[in-house]
Amino acid sequence: MSDEMIYGDGAIRRQGLYGSSIENTYAGVLSFMRRNYSRDLEGVDVAVSGIPLDLSVTFRSGARMGPQAIRAASVQLAELKPYPWGFDPFEDLAVVDYGDCWFDAHNPLTIKPSIIEHARTILASGAKMLTFGGDHYVTYPLLIAHAEKYGKPLALLHFDAHCDTWPDDSPDSLNHGTMFYKAVKEGLIDPKKSVQVGIRTWNDDFMGLNVLGAPWVHDNGVDATIAEIKKTIGDAPVYVTFDIDCLDPSAAPGTGTPVPGGLTTAQALKIIRNLGDLNIVGMDVVEVAPSYDQSEITAIAAAHIACDMLCLMRNKKVAGTL
């Protein structure tokens, strides 16, 4: 049977990497946007994977269920061409759902190496990564692997309510509020080329990163925010990380450390959709904690953000710049 004639469970029945199958949105295997579940990365442009870790949270746990929730929320996006793009990204972009990173949660010292090796395996194939957390700590080992692949320092585009640059000089700690302190100290990211968007918690030392706080975004507007991001990052290889608590709790209650005054979903989506000029080398969406969600609106927002990231990658491939 040809792939276009498959009805249901295309994630495990589809033979090719491209195109979409016909699915019921309320049934079937929950890969991200119904992509093939596969660890075969030959010819793959982007590998989606999850890191179900929430051992480093400082308030509410539950982000370990984030990858599963984002996949479940994505099924409605696989039914139609994404708005406002007007195309099926999977006609041109080869995307697989690689499954989840395995780690031993009862042996914390092995978690960081496990995530690094997971990322190295994917990046060595030539595929780019779109990763779902899990808490935000996962971005730190992902940055290590991406800096090995693409050279350091990288630029960082960081959407969040928190700066995550609180001091932490322990090499073995698991803390979702200190990753970018370590990333700057270790030369993984260039603070002068990095931008944090949506910040609305205080830190005495922002480590030299350029901060566009949530009040700044509200006062100056989305277009000015996009312009500042592009001006600061330029053509540097950039890793994009989106902590869902960048959004206001009214739009994303399902997260571990919500902070009032955040971006609206519309603001965030417009920013993401206008990042096509950036040299994006890796992406993640983290901190979705579905046990605190209402009507799945947080997971749905995360799935839309991730879908827009893939649409950016599709356009880059079509333009020959992926």
Swiss-Prot record:
Cofactor: Mn(2+)
Pathway linked to the protein: Amine and polyamine biosynthesis; putrescine biosynthesis via agmatine pathway; putrescine from agmatine: step 1/1
Catalytic reactions of this protein: agmatine + H2O = urea + putrescine
BP terms from Gene Ontology: putrescine biosynthetic process from arginine, via agmatine; spermidine biosynthetic process
Record keyword DNA-binding present: no
Keyword Nucleotide-binding in annotation: no
Enzyme Commission number(s) from the entry: 3.5.3.11
Pfam families (alphabetical): Arginase
Source organism superkingdom: Bacteria
GO molecular function: agmatinase activity; manganese ion binding
Key words, A-Z: Hydrolase, Manganese, Metal-binding, Polyamine biosynthesis, Putrescine biosynthesis, Spermidine biosynthesis
Residues annotated as binding Mn(2+): 136, 160, 162, 164, 243, 245
Assigned protein family: Belongs to the arginase family. Agmatinase subfamily.
Stated role: Catalyzes the formation of putrescine from agmatine.
Name the UniProt record assigns to this protein: Agmatinase
